[in-house]
């Protein structure tokens, strides 16, 4: 191993090249060589490819194009069937031995063209639309990749313990902050650093232009790491040693100047769900096409759509798991098309066929083959389940295990290399499966007698390979490639650089990696933002509806406001809320955070700078916010009776608009700086509360500066305070308010008007009028001289927020670089398991234990597992279905998704459900499992000839395609939860737990049974999904939807083999499967094959080696080629319009008229007749749920408590908010005195608790929504637990944290403010605080229980906040309410009663002492004292207040309140309200809880809509009309 880094002696001799390519010539297809003006007759040898007629002569582009029509079929044959290189005698001889297969596949290739609507990929590529070509027709961008001695370093990620609530709380006091700081300033990191290990070890090789390399290895072996390294995506690695070059360009130069030319297509499909397929592709091309070439964009889009068979989805939303859009397979094709739209020269594809059926996967691979050949691209692919047809399309293969290179070389030599080492390849195994199995100690097989001598570990296999001739050939090729570059003076590379430079816009620097200028990037992102707005019309309309509603509500509350002094304070309130309500919505945070992964990928593709997105959102904000502000300001301004002077209105409009823009920018800044959406909501919510508190409305400016010694400075950094001063001074400037009669002091008989004062701050002695400017100066210290200064300050804040956002978008990256290691719960057993599982092999999600194919260890323990299998609950009942049809509403009509499907499931029978993407496989499973929630299902589904009973769903297991679990539970906890709640209620609990032990043992999950499910890899989660269903002992049938999707071939085989054992033990199984290998399909007994539209084209036995299926199609003139995968043959045959006697075969009709179908129908009828005669055993009472409701509730409550404990962000967020708001509230109003302003501050201090719900509800709603979604999707359909248990558990789990949060908030707020310390008052307020925290939790839950979607909830929440904030008698006194609101809204507002109760408890004990400026000043008539003149007024007319200086003869001062009781009466709070309000508020809390139960049952279980469908029906008609108008415009634009 010491010589690993030494290059073996490389020869420049042509013969040393393992591919027989002359060193000085290009490695190209013979077919393509005809298009080069520099080719010789050696390029078109005896194999007779392109240019045969002109052999020996240079072929011109014109001549080649004249021959193109005749030649393109030959190119297709060359491209698709691996007889590519005329110079490769070994490959040619191999192809010549397969004449029959080639003939058949040529016929299928021609049918492929018909299937794609006549689209010819070769012709399209040769046309030069997707990339530039030379005058000779050659691709202008040709770049090969060479890598020498590459070692990739990664941080060691061992198994760890789950982070719990105490860990999060302790982390707040330093450790978490320290980690964040060290992330950006590594020099501050002290102590032991995490160890660094090799992810890849000493890789060398070359992939030349026009070549395809298949990278094979099990998940975690290093395949994704290798692809990312080649794609120059190194951010997630600790370091990369060695050299990677791209046509002679260094990795550094490539990343800096040509980043978009080398791309990595990740496994997951991340797109903006509200964009259509056409918009997604157009956006990609806009950013990769300069203005001069923009006419080619529609042509390329059309070609890409045809290429991948998704033309019909052109105007369909891409969608995701929450937004309905294209299917999963179609979404994968969109991802592929988007990557091709980058026009890159080197592309690395990471498991891009996941979710595609075998036929589509093969079509995709063929398309890559053609593009690689014709465009001379360099292509690297990793596939987990590669069929032989796909493997034969590859030039090279690289086998990786544990980060080590086991083989690299020609694909057609790999199998023999390992056979020569002593490995055995089973006859039915594909080459890719065989090569992958070498990495699995439990799956690989050795030749008899060579078990000991054959190398086994990754290190041994690597060492053997590096001593082999194949490794020397690698170095020969690397040296030959480098010599070629040197001899040609890097001609191709220089042409590549020149072509890339020419493809850029004129305004873009030639050294920039981007194609278009920042202006065009922003313009494209602006267009996309408008598309996103229009694509989510429900949210858009909901938002504007709420805005208009809030405007009407606010203005109606202040409608008819008096112009005299009595309306001064309320007018200030109206202005305050008018600048506040538009910024209450935190909906901007979600898209800003959730789209990060997409933006990061687009940055790697060199589409645009991340800052372009931030700038584009600002640009879109201008019209979007304008459209929000216009209706709102018009409604509020004129309905509240503000000054109708034009200049004042437009100034008001300007500040509302600017403020909304500013705070929206603030939200985006927090989103850009926050790692998660939870953090963004938390910090933005806290910031909003601080802005409201320190705006100068709750506490006047001077009070903040002088009295709030800790936080008063926040007034100066608060943009809302400047806006509030501006709109307030704008309204009150030049306004003179006459004193309201009720505010004249004194009043009554004998009072001389000349000796009266006005009870409003700012009034002057002896004057009955009050100047608005003086009122503002005295009350708020506001002046209109600051108007335009304030405008400039708000603009400055906006610019600051935008700058921080733009910089953060460019600098910060919160996108993870791969999966993590296993995470365990804290226990003694898991401590040992953690130590065993601390090592991994890749920066990807590693296979820690329970590795792929671990189930293959069944041979070692076959006896014990066989006995355990026999103990599984087997049934002799038979499930039959006949003429099943399923129809759903579609547009103005209906669409049939299943059409007359027949079949049966017997014990011991394993049925494969197959079909192309969108054929209806999952639909059929859901229909048979009685899980459809909409549409009409017809047909007969019977068990033993009898109708399905209430226990049917409980007697079946259903494994979803998506592994839906509580991600915070451990494997054992999930299985025990399923077993206890789903097995028969009469089974002892210990017996159920013992059964779980058997399942864990059978599934080989012992070593990771205490691992958190959220940390598992794909294959482990799939086994847990199966285990959860097996733990329920399904007595009838086990449904599985794509159990092998996303798994490598060995993991897929292990899963299916385990299912086979279950089937042999008596379990009936119906399983959908996408890409079964030959070995995989042989595990099934029967196959039910569907075509699109839910039409059956075959149902029957597979037969040994697929003979029964092959015979069925052979009888109809379609012969399966020898060694062809039967599953692939079925799908490909059904997908293509195969010719028979000059006509196209309708396979659906063929099946309906076949003898096999008649036999199946007869058998179903026979089963029904025979089984229906068997008497039904008396089972007693049939229960919908196996476990009693009490057991369901207790177990679910325990699980939810564990979930909140192990996912601390939820509980921690509540504690964090309580602490922060409590501190700000308590210490801002620190130890209030007894003045009137302090009484007002007491009132607002109590009132400020309503600032907590907007933050808390934004965390309650997502948590409840996620749990509700899991219950609706899996746990309720499986009848694990019912609606009552779900509601009760969610309600109970909120109570402890509500009490703790209330206690923390109360301690930090109540005593610092200086409220009464007697136990009666303090205890009562704590009790009310606890009820309030319980109220807000249940409030959020019932809203979420009722609302149809999370988006609607987010937009509706502000409406509720407005209602409870306004109609409680604080913002506007109850006596001034308009009649419409006065007699109902005030009383149905729960917050009203909370405020009245708390105020009635803490106010009465306060004796008020007026400050001089708070008293009303007036002079008594000459010769009278204040008491003599105004005593009667105070005692009999006013009945409240007192004279500060009764004996004075001038400047009398009247204090309007003598104590807190008199003050609270103005708030409509009475002496006896205390316990009455407690009882009423408690009733509201109970009603909230009742509503949770009510809406979950009625809406989620019963499906009631409460007329919402009719309400929005008219809106839907209007929307459709608008859509038609815009769709016509869109079609014109696309054409």
Curated annotation (Swiss-Prot):
The keyword Transmembrane helix applies. It comes from the Eukaryota. Residues 1-115, 834-868 are annotated as: Disordered. ATP binds at residues 915-922. InterPro entries: AAA+_ATPase (IPR003593), ABC2_TM (IPR013525), ABC_trans_N (IPR029481), ABC_transporter-like_ATP-bd (IPR003439), ABC_transporter-like_CS (IPR017871), ABCG_PDR_1 (IPR034001), ABCG_PDR_2 (IPR034003), P-loop_NTPase (IPR027417). Residues 185-427, 879-1117 form the ABC transporter domain. Residues 79-93 have a biased composition (Basic residues). SUPFAM superfamilies: P-loop containing nucleoside triphosphate hydrolases. The chain crosses the membrane at residues 540-560, 573-593, 618-638, 646-666, 680-700, 703-723, 791-811, 1212-1232, 1246-1266, 1295-1315, 1320-1340, 1342-1362, 1384-1406, 1477-1497, 1503-1523. It is found in: Cell membrane. Disruption phenotype: Leads to voriconazole sensitivity of the yap1-mutated voriconazole-resistant strain. It catalyses: voriconazole(in) + ATP + H2O = voriconazole(out) + ADP + phosphate + H(+). Residues 34-45 have a biased composition (Low complexity). Residues 46-76 have a biased composition (Basic and acidic residues). Keywords: ATP-binding, Cell membrane, Glycoprotein, Membrane, Nucleotide-binding, Repeat, Transmembrane, Transmembrane helix, Transport. Its main location: membrane. Induction: Expression is highly up-regulated in the presence of miconazole. Expression is controlled by the AP-1-like transcription factor yap1. The promoter contains a putative Yap1 response element YRE (5'-TTAGTAA-3') from -462 to -456 relative to the start codon. Glycans are attached at residues 33, 149, 274, 287, 351, 892, 1459. It is a multi-pass membrane protein. Pfam families: ABC2_membrane, ABC_tran, ABC_trans_N, PDR_CDR. Gene3D superfamilies: P-loop containing nucleotide triphosphate hydrolases. GO terms for molecular function: ABC-type transporter activity; ATP binding; ATP hydrolysis activity. Belongs to the ABC transporter superfamily. ABCG family. PDR (TC 3.A.1.205) subfamily. Pleiotropic ABC efflux transporter involved in the basal level of azole susceptibility. Confers resistance to voriconazole. This is ABC multidrug transporter atrF. It comes from Aspergillus flavus (strain ATCC 200026 / FGSC A1120 / IAM 13836 / NRRL 3357 / JCM 12722 / SRRC 167). The gene is atrF.
């Amino acid at each position: 191993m010491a010589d690993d880094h030494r290059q073996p002696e490389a020869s420049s001799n042509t013969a040393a090249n393992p591919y027989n390519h002359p060193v000085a010539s290009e490695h190209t297809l013979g077919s393509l060589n005809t298009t080069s003006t520099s080719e010789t007759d050696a390029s078109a040898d005896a194999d007779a490819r392109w240019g045969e007629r002109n052999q020996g002569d240079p072929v011109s582009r014109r001549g080649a194009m004249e021959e193109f029509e005749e030649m393109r079929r030959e190119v297709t044959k060359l491209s698709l069937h691996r007889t590519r290189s005329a110079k490769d005698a070994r490959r040619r001889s191999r192809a010549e031995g397969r004449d029959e297969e080639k003939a058949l596949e040529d016929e299928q290739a021609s049918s492929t063209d018909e299937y794609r609507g006549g689209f010819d990929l070769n012709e399209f590529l040769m046309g030069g639309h997707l990339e530039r070509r030379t005058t000779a027709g050659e691709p202008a961008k040709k770049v090969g990749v060479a890598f020498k001695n590459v070692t990739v370093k990664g941080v060691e990620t061992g198994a760890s313990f789950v982070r719990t609530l105490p860990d999060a709380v302790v982390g707040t006091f330093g450790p978490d902050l320290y980690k964040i700081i060290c992330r950006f300033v590594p020099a501050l990191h002290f102590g032991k650093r995490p160890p660094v290990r090799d992810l890849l070890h000493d890789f060398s090789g070359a992939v030349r232009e026009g070549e395809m390399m298949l990278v094979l290895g099990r998940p975690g072996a290093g395949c994704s790491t290798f692809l990312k390294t080649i794609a120059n995506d190194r951010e997630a690695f600790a370091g990369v040693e060695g050299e990677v070059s791209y046509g002679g360009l260094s990795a550094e130069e490539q990343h800096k100047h040509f980043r978009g030319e080398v791309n990595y297509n990740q496994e997951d499909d991340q797109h903006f769900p509200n964009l259509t397929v056409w918009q997604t592709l157009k956006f990609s091309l806009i950013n990769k096409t300069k203005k001069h070439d923009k006419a080619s964009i529609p042509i390329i889009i059309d070609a890409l759509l045809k290429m991948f068979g998704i033309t019909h989805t052109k105007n369909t939303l891409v969608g995701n798991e929450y937004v309905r859009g294209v299917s999963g397979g179609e979404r994968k094709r969109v991802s592929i098309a988007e990557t091709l739209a980058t026009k890159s020269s080197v592309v690395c594809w990471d498991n891009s066929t996941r979710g595609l059926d075998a036929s589509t996967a093969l079509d995709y691979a063929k398309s890559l083959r053609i593009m690689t050949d014709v465009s001379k691209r360099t292509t690297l692919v990793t596939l987990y389940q590669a069929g032989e047809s796909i493997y034969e399309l590859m030039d090279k293969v690289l086998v990786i295990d544990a980060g080590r290179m086991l083989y690299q070389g020609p694909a057609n030599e790999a199998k023999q290399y390992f056979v020569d080492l002593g490995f055995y390849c089973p006859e039915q195994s594909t080459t890719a499966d065989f090569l992958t199995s070498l990495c699995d100690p439990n799956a690989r097989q050795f030749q008899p007698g060579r078990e000991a001598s054959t190398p086994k570990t990754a290190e041994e296999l690597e060492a053997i390979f590096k001593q082999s001739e194949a490794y020397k050939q690698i170095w020969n090729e690397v040296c030959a490639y480098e010599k070629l570059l040197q001899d040609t003076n890097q001609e191709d590379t220089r042409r590549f650089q020149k072509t890339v430079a020419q493809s850029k816009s004129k305004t873009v620097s030639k050294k920039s990696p981007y194609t278009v200028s920042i202006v065009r990037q922003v313009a494209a992102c602006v267009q996309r933002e408008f598309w996103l707005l229009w694509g989510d019309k429900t949210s858009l309309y909901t938002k504007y509806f709420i805005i208009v509603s809030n405007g009407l509500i606010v203005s109606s509350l202040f409608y008819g406001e008096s112009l005299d002094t009595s309306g001064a304070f309320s007018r200030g309130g109206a202005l305050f809320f008018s600048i506040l309500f538009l910024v209450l919505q935190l909906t901007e945070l979600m898209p800003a955070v959730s789209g990060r992964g997409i933006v990061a990928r687009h940055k790697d593709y060199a589409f645009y700078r991340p800052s372009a997105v931030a700038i584009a959102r600002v640009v879109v904000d201008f019209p979007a916010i304008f459209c929000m502000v216009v209706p709102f300001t018009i409604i509020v301004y004129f309905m509240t009776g503000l000054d109708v002077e034009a200049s004042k209105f437009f100034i008001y409009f300007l500040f509302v608009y600017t403020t909304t823009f500013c705070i929206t920018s603030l939200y985006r800044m927090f989103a850009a700086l926050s790692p998660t959406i939870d953090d963004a909501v938390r910090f933005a919510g806290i910031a909003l509360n601080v802005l409201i508190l320190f705006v100068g409305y709750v506490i006047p400016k001077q009070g903040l500066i002088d009295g709030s010694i800790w936080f008063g400075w926040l007034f100066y950094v608060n943009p809302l305070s400047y806006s509030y001063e501006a709109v307030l001074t704008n309204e009150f400037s030049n306004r003179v308010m006459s004193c309201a009669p009720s505010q004249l002091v004194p009043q009554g008989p004998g009072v001389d008007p000349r000796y009266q004062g006005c009870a409003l701050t700012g009034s002057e002695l002896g004057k009955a009028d009050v100047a608005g400017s003086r009122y503002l100066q005295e009350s708020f210290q506001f002046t209109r001289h600051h108007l335009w200064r304030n405008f400039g300050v708000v603009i400055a804040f906006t610019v600051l927020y935008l700058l921080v956002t733009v910089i953060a978008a460019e600098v910060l990256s919160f996108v993870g670089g791969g999966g993590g290691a296993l995470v365990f719960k804290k226990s003694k057993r898991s401590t040992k398991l953690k130590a065993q599982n601390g090592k991994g092999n890749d920066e990807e999600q590693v296979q820690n234990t329970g590795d792929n194919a671990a189930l293959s260890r069944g041979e070692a323990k076959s006896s014990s597992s066989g006995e355990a299998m026999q103990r599984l609950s087997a049934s002799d009942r038979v499930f039959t279905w006949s003429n099943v049809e399923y129809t759903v509403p579609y547009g103005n009509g209906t669409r049939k998704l299943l059409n007359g499907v027949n079949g049966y499931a017997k014990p011991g029978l394993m049925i494969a459900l197959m079909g192309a993407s969108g054929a209806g496989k999952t639909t059929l499973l859901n229909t048979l499992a009685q899980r459809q929630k909409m549409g009409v299902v017809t047909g007969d589904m019977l068990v033993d000839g009898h109708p399905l009973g209430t226990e049917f769903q409980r007697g079946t297991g259903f494994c979803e395609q998506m592994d839906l679990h509580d991600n915070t539970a451990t494997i054992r906890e999930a299985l025990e939860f399923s077993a206890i709640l789903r097995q028969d209620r009469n089974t002892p609990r210990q017996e159920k737990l013992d059964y779980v032990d058997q399942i864990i043992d059978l599934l080989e999950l012992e070593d990771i049974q205490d691992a958190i499910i959220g940390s598992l890899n794909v294959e482990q989660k799939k086994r847990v999904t199966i285990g959860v269903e097996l733990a329920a002992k399904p007595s009838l049938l086990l449904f599985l939807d794509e159990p092998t999707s996303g798994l490598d071939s060995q993991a897929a085989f292990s899963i299916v083999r385990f299912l086979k054992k279950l089937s042999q033990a008596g379990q009936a199984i119906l399983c959908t499967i996408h890409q079964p290998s030959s070995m995989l399909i042989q595990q099934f007994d029967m196959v039910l094959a569907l075509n699109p539209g839910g039409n059956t084209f075959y149902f029957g036995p597979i037969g040994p080696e697929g003979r029964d299926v092959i015979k069925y199609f052979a009888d109809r003139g379609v012969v399966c080629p020898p060694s062809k995968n039967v599953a692939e043959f079925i799908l490909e045959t059904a997908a293509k319009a195969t010719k028979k006697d000059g006509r196209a075969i309708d396979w659906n009709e063929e099946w309906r008229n076949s003898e096999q179908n008649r036999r199946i129908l007869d058998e179903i009828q026979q089963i029904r007749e025979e089984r229906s005669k068997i008497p039904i055993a008396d089972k007693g009472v049939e229960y919908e749920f196996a476990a009693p409701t009490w057991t369901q509730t207790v177990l679910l409550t325990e699980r939810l408590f564990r979930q909140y404990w192990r996912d601390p962000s939820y509980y921690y967020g509540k504690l964090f908010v309580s602490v922060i708001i409590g501190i700000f509230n308590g210490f801002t109003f620190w130890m209030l005195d007894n003045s009137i302003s302090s009484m007002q501050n007491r009132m607002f201090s109590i009132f400020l608790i309503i600032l907590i719900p907007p933050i808390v509800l934004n965390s309650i709603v997502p948590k409840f929504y996620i749990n509700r979604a899991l219950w609706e999707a899996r746990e309720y359909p499986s009848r694990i637990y019912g609606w009552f248990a779900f509601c009760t558990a969610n309600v109970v789990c909120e109570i402890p944290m509500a009490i703790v949060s209330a206690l923390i908030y109360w301690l930090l707020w109540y005593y610092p403010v200086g409220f009464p310390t007697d136990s009666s008052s303090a205890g009562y307020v704590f009790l009310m605080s606890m009820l309030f925290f319980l109220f807000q939790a249940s409030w959020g839950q019932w809203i979420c229980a009722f609302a149809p979607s999370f988006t609607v909830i987010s937009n509706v929440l502000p409406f509720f906040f407005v209602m409870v904030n306004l109609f409680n008698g604080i913002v506007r006194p109850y006596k001034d309410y308009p009649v419409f609101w006065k007699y109902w809204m005030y009383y149905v507002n729960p917050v009203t009663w909370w405020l009245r109760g708390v105020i009635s408890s803490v106010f009465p004990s306060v004796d008020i002492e007026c400050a001089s400026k708070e008293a009303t000043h007036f002079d008594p008539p000459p010769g009278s004292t204040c008491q003599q003149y105004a005593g009667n007024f105070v005692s009999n007319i006013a009945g409240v207040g007192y004279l500060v200086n009764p004996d004075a003869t001038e400047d009398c001062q009247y204090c309007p309140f003598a104590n807190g009781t008199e003050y609270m009466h103005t708030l409509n709070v009475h002496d006896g309200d205390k316990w009455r309000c407690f009882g009423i508020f408690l009733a509201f809390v109970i009603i909230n809880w009742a509503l949770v139960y009510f809406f979950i049952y009625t809406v989620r279980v019963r499906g009631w809509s409460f007329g919402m469908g009719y309400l929005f029906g008219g809106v839907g008609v209007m929307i459709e009309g608008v859509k038609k108008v815009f769709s016509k415009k869109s079609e014109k634009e696309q054409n």
